[in-house]
Amino acid sequence: MLSPKRTKYRKYHRGRMRGAKTRGNEICFGNFGLQALEPTWITSRQIEAARRTITRYTKRGAKLWIRIFPDKTVTARAAESRMGSGKGAVDYWVAVVKPGTIIFEIGSVPEEIAKTALNLAAYKLPIKTKFIIKDNIS
């Protein structure tokens, strides 16, 4: 699973996801991409499940770029613990995804294979997504 090697702080506030993404919303590396249409947190397990789906479907013939990284911690309290006594322990890592964010990019495969692979990966994610194509494919 993806997680940072070290962070400035162990625990973070939840924050709010307002507005659309202004950076990271265009295809930079591959020819095809999967773009988020809703704001959400995507866990490192969900990213890994989608990555495995893409690599299995393309039979490792595609070049894959993961454009999001889970750099925020989510904490959880132990079951049946009393209120108070501080914030819970770190449970898992999430990537904050806003509408317009490119989640995955894929290259070196035909459009039909890329579209099917990214649609299969989209089933593993908790949001609505759309398949996009780079403008200047030569």
From Swiss-Prot:
Main location: plastid
Protein keywords: Chloroplast, Plastid, Ribonucleoprotein, Ribosomal protein
Protein name (database record): Large ribosomal subunit protein uL16c
UniProt key word Zinc: no
Signal peptide (UniProt feature, chain positions): none
Organism: Phaeodactylum tricornutum (strain CCAP 1055/1)
Annotated localization: Plastid, Chloroplast
A GO-annotated cellular component: chloroplast
